[in-house]
């Protein structure tokens, strides 16, 4: 789900109609798990459905609606199972030769009417990269996670063609101008490694982007740990924060939890940035602490109880 003012968007990634576009026939369930999004608006104290939205190239197992983000009159929808081998913005949607490569669809509302504005793919589309597994929209900036992307690049705008780091993950940033959407950055972790899943969760707020790699393995703790290369805490997880000046992105900080341990998956299911505040969930954290700033972070007496960490 995503809420913006009096508008609520709800994803149903396993919905199965073969409709396309906005307001199609919902009753023909011949496209299994193609997915759909429902938009509701509030007037006074009452909610009503405003739109039923499908992909422009509906296909089985696309999971349209698995991720979505609403910002004012703009809605971004991820379909991580979409299968075309197109690249960039506005490519050929009908060539299903890259299974699970994924796509993102942007819709714009004028008055009460929704219409598709853009069809977006990765610049280095690859089968099973799952582009669109996560999306985050802030004004004219869109961040898209592809957690199973395979390149061994690091940092900003590296070489995305060398697929020797399987499922390391990547994030793509797009920006809207008067002429439409275009890719602004291709982002990888500073310590890219196979299986880290960089991009399983993304959150953008203005010129700040937070990216989770829930399967990152380092044994570091806290802010900017210098042990990124020590992979002795499997799936402990990490979050990377990037900032933009003009059109240039750079990594600002590398974050681990203060009590980072194996299988905590810090950031995997939850990361949210708003202004100067960042919240990160770790659903596999095991401490028996309760409330705020418990002093029992090292007591692993409550298996998978989970925790949330706030950074500023």
Language model features with spans:
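Conserved beta-strand/short-helix segments
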Residues: 1-312
